[in-house]
Swiss-Prot record:
The lineage of its organism: Eukaryota, Metazoa, Chordata, Craniata, Vertebrata. It is found in: Nucleus. The keyword GTP-binding does not apply. It comes from Xenopus laevis (African clawed frog). One of its GO terms (cellular component) is nucleolus. This is DNA topoisomerase 1. The gene is top1.
């Protein structure tokens, strides 16, 4: 210890020499500051931010002086200073425990003498730093220096006798003042790391915001760049998030604005609406004559047609490559109506359609069609914008203070009538509809649509018991055409809802109705017997009533009540079955209905009775018509019609077929095939047929080519998998195992793709002559399909496309369908 004291004395003398010139001034300041010490300490806790700037400035000035003083003190002071800073940051163990104890004692000796001369004039905020740093430092060292407490006390007494000042902390313990926190010119270097560490004791000051110091600028070049790079993506993601948020808000707003009509009370007494306002129809654009270089020839001679005759000629020219123009009835009807539009001279000249040359006109319209396909993006956008403008202006109406979409707000342009099936009036001219042909329907208190300039409406009505907005009579069959609301509208939704609910009610009394008509087979009245047999056919075969016509239905179709003797054949036994009836007649759209069905013996006997003494073109049910049948159906159940029977039988057939065909272990494509097969059974029941598409054979060849290519791909994948497995047995390393797993997954993926293609081919082949969409959209209760999808995990998008989901699956239907495929939700069990 004597050697240590000698060494310490020499150090103290060196320190005294440096500070001797300031001694008297500091003593004076010390006496003044000691008086306010306690008060200032308390005050500094709340005013750190006010004193930080001047204290930081002093720190910077004193760092420069410390650098100069450190050069004078030499290596000895550097080691001592390094040990001092390592003590603060917890790095004391690097230089060994042996030197640490000795250096700590020397360090404390020097600090005590410095406190005597230099610590008196410290600033208030710096003294607070010092006390808190010392307190933290002591907390970290108290376990290591517990055995040396007595020695420290003795040393403190010695220094106090020499005039040293003790700095008393808030916890009541004396602690040496640390050199590293000394802002004075004491010849010690304060590193940026040490200064940075000083921020920790200020954690209790909530308002304190550490000021960046110059010594950190070296690190901040790269760091700041990284921070900027980190910030940019965040801003981007935030912007993206905002966009998504806006989209979600828009979608949510649209959902909120959607009319929840199913929650409102319905109008009574047949009232469909109380307020209706719209802008009227959009008429077809006027005819634009073809250019002069587009010639028409008759019998090899150039003929200049009048505008009206030329317009009708263009209708035929546009269809020149179609099979319709080869049909005699089409050509005959066209030529007859075309001559009505000709002038007298043209009628006298053009007497034979076969001598007319429409090739130049046809070529011109083909070029026009190609030009439309090759339009620039800007041209297409311009047309799209114009269509959108018309849609916003004419495509919506206000019904009962709600905006509703109109289905077909454009008047059909003039052209040639094609009809459904082999219609006898195909080829006739559909005349241009003018405002004078139009009947407007709207509410009295609405703004009545304005007719085009120079024209007026035929009539304006205010009939709230009908759902159409505009009507006119077309000239081909004299039928009335309408502009109606979109299928997603309230009126259409209510109509569909009522139709399916009526079919569900029929389930409750269908057995009673069946028992009734079976009893009527034995009635003494021929009228009752015919009615009972017709109802049996409607129930069992889902036949249409006959004269019951829907919009656009042609006049040459045959239904149940309009069957003639020539349409059926009776077989006592056929193909091992008794009492077989063969039906063969043109159904709706002139589609042939051909079916052989075994019937009840009583029905068979009645049919023989009905056919007695009748010619082939005589009515089979000569005592029955649709009015009599519908009246009887209404007596059996309110709202019951032949169409309700078709809806009921179609829906229950779908439900039964889904139960039989669906396998819960199948994958989604196989389940969809099962659904389509169930749908196919319904389409066959309802006779929803179609002609095979012209491109069917070509599309099947392309599909078969894809299947063959996929099979080759699967064979290659299996070979690679087998080879990888063989390598894995030899190498037995992780990389080979991963390769085997990858090849295995590739085989499974290709197998699944092949199966999808094969299912698609089967589906197409089975349904090439079956129209699945008609029954799906008009006769099948959507709740059955929705419940099936939920039960078997099939996306509803695989069953209904976007438009169908919007129009058919209204919110009311969705809300009443749960994921449980139970008897209540199955609708018809």
């Amino acid at each position: 210890m004597s050697e240590d004291h000698v060494q310490n004395d020499s150090q103290i003398e060196a320190v005294f020499r440096v500070n001797d010139s300031h001694k008297h001034k500091k003593d004076k300041e010390h006496r003044h500051k000691e008086h306010k010490k306690d008060k200032d300490r308390e005050k500094s806790k709340h005013n750190n931010s006010e004193h930080r700037d001047p204290s930081e400035k002093k720190h910077k000035d004193k760092h420069k002086n410390n650098d100069k003083h450190r050069e004078k003190d030499g290596e000895k002071h550097r080691e001592r200073d390094g040990e001092k800073h390592r003590d603060k940051n917890g790095e004391k163990h690097r230089d060994g425990e042996k030197h640490k104890e000795k250096d700590i004692e020397k360090h404390k000796e020097v600090e005590k003498h410095r406190v005597k001369d230099g610590e008196k004039h410290k600033e208030k905020d710096v003294e607070k730093h010092k006390e808190k740093d010392v307190e933290k430092h002591r907390d970290g060292e108290k376990h290591k220096h517990r055995d040396k407490d007595r020695e420290k006390k003795k040393e403190e007494k010695m220094k106090s006798s020499s005039g040293g000042v003790k700095v008393k902390k808030e916890n009541g313990f004396s602690s040496p003042v640390r050199v590293k926190d000394e802002p004075e010119d004491q010849g010690f270097y304060v590193s940026p790391k040490e200064n940075k560490a000083m921020k920790r004791p200020r954690e209790d000051d909530e308002d304190y915001k550490p000021k960046k110091i110059k010594s950190e600028d070296d690190k901040k070049g790269k760091k700041r760049k990284q921070e900027e790079e980190d910030i940019k993506p965040k801003k981007k993601s935030k912007a993206k998030g905002n966009e998504e948020g806006v989209k979600k808000k828009k979608v949510k707003k649209e959902e909120e604005e959607k009319w929840k009509w199913w929650e409102e009370e319905r109008h009574r007494d047949g009232i469909k609406w109380k307020f209706l306002e719209h802008k009227g129809p959009v008429f077809a654009p006027p005819y634009e004559p073809v250019p002069d270089n587009v010639k028409f020839y008759y019998d090899g001679n150039l003929v200049k047609l009048s505008p009206k005759a030329e317009e009708v000629a263009t209708f035929f020219a546009k269809m020149l490559d179609h099979e319709y123009t080869t049909k005699d009835i089409f050509r005959k009807n066209f030529f007859k109506d075309w001559k009505k539009e000709m002038t007298t001279d043209e009628r006298n000249l053009i007497t034979n359609l076969s001598k007319c040359d429409f090739n130049a006109m046809s070529l011109y319209f083909k070029e026009q069609s190609e030009a439309r396909k090759n339009m620039t993006k800007e041209e297409k956008l311009k047309i799209k914008a114009e269509n959108e403008r018309l849609l916003q202006e004419y495509g919506y109406c206000i019904m009962d203070n709600h905006k509703e979409r109109i289905a077909n707000f454009r008047i059909e342009p003039p052209g040639l009538f094609r009809g459904r099936g082999d219609h006898p009036k195909m080829g006739k001219l559909k005349k241009r509809i003018m405002p004078e042909d139009i009947i407007i329907n709207c509410s009295k208190d609405s703004k009545i649509p304005v007719a085009p300039a120079g024209h007026k409406w035929k009539e304006v009505r205010h009939d709230g018991k009908v759902t159409w907005l505009v009507s006119w009579t077309e000239n081909i069959q004299g039928s009335i055409k309408y502009i109606m609301l979109n299928p997603s509208s309230r009126i259409k939704g209510e109509k569909d809802w009522q139709k399916y609910e009526t079919a569900r009610r029929l389930k409750m009394c269908v057995e009673k109705i069946r028992n009734t008509y079976k009893e009527d087979w034995k009635s003494k009245e021929m009228k009752v017997r015919q009615r009972a047999v017709a109802l049996y056919f409607i129930d069992k075969l889902a036949l249409r009533a006959g004269n019951e016509k829907e919009e656009g239905e042609t006049a040459d179709t045959v239904g149940c009540c309009s069957l003639r003797v020539e349409h059926i054949n009776l077989f006592q036994e056929l193909d091992g079955q008794e009492f077989v009836v063969e039906f063969d007649f043109p159904g709706k759209d002139s589609i042939r209905y051909y079916n052989k069905v075994p019937v009840e013996k009583r029905v068979f006997k009645n049919l023989q009775l009905f056919m007695e003494n009748k010619q082939p073109d005589d009515d089979l049910f000569d005592r029955l018509n649709t009015s009599i049948l519908n009246k009887h159906l209404q007596d059996l159940m309110e709202g019951l019609t032949a169409k309700v029977f078709r809806t009921y039988n179609a829906s229950i057939t779908l439900q039964q077929q889904l139960d039989e065909l669906t396998n819960s272990d199948d994958n989604v494509p196989a389940k969809i095939l099962s659904y389509n097969r169930a749908n196919r059974a319904v389409a066959i029941l309802c006779n929803h047929q179609r002609a095979p598409p012209k491109t069917f054979e070509k599309s099947m060849m392309n599909l078969q080519g894809k299947i063959d290519a996929k099979k080759d791909q699967l064979a290659d994948a299996r070979r690679e998998f087998k080879s990888a497995k063989a390598d894995a047995k030899v190498r037995r390393d992780e990389k080979t195992k991963k390769l085997v797993e990858s090849k295995k997954k590739a085989v499974q993926r290709i197998e699944e793709q092949l199966m999808k293609l094969e299912v698609q081919a089967t589906d197409r082949e089975e349904n090439k002559q079956i129209a699945l969409g008609t029954s799906k959209l008009n006769y099948l209760d959507p709740r059955i399909s929705v419940a099936w999808c939920k039960k078997y995990g099939v996306p509803i998008e695989k069953i209904y496309n976007k438009t169908q989901r919007k129009n058919l699956l209204g919110p009311s239907i969705w809300q009443t369908t749960t994921s449980n495929f139970n008897a209540e939700q199955r609708c018809f069990s």
